[in-house]
Amino acid sequence: MALCLKQVFAKDKTFRPRKRFEPGTQRFELYKKAQASLKSGLDLRSVVRLPPGENIDDWIAVHVVDFFNRINLIYGTMAERCSETSCPVMAGGPRYEYRWQDERQYRRPAKLSAPRYMALLMDWIEGLINDEEVFPTRVGVPFPKNFQQVCTKILTRLFRVFVHVYIHHFDSILSMGAEAHVNTCYKHFYYFIREFSLVDQRELEPLREMTERICH
């Protein structure tokens, strides 16, 4: 499993991401630029900065999709250890509980098991990034005015996946030999959301001590 995860983070060939960028599009070129910077060994704080002359919404869109794919993968590798029995509530330790709310089935905040919450979350995000009105892919079609607010909600909920995985399934990360890869993904995610102020500081509190240790 560790080898599989290592290969995935290296070349994205051992799994099928839920969303790809179309070759030949501006966003595909931005994605390639971002990936090249990651592989070059540059400091992650530098990697997340908006390249000169690029549109900030395009840059955010590329990263939201990439983080969705990677975090979906991280959770997927340990999903069998996150069950209705082991994780009856979506939580981040004893102090933090996350309830699910959407515009369809759960109009009021609902207490759900972690696997149920994760399934709804990934489907919800996939629906948004495949919605042309939210994440337009055609040249010349502008992003909606509330695009960054939508991305804030997506990234806030994805951060909660990190919270749950680190606090409740860190032993699984260690047993798979995946700690370095998950930490790198987290640091990349953290520097990005801080660079563009996309997640409220209060949401980051559950992992504050760990973040201070690995994101120094």
Swiss-Prot record:
Keywords per UniProt: Metal-binding, Zinc
SUPFAM superfamilies: Mob1/phocein
GO biological process: signal transduction
Superkingdom in the source lineage: Eukaryota
UniProt-listed InterPro entries: MOB_kinase_act_fam, MOB_kinase_act_sf
Disulfide bonds: none
Function: May regulate the activity of kinases.
Family: Belongs to the MOB1/phocein family.
Designated name of the protein: MOB kinase activator 3C
Species per Swiss-Prot/TrEMBL record: Homo sapiens (Human)
Gene transcribed to yield this protein: MOB3C
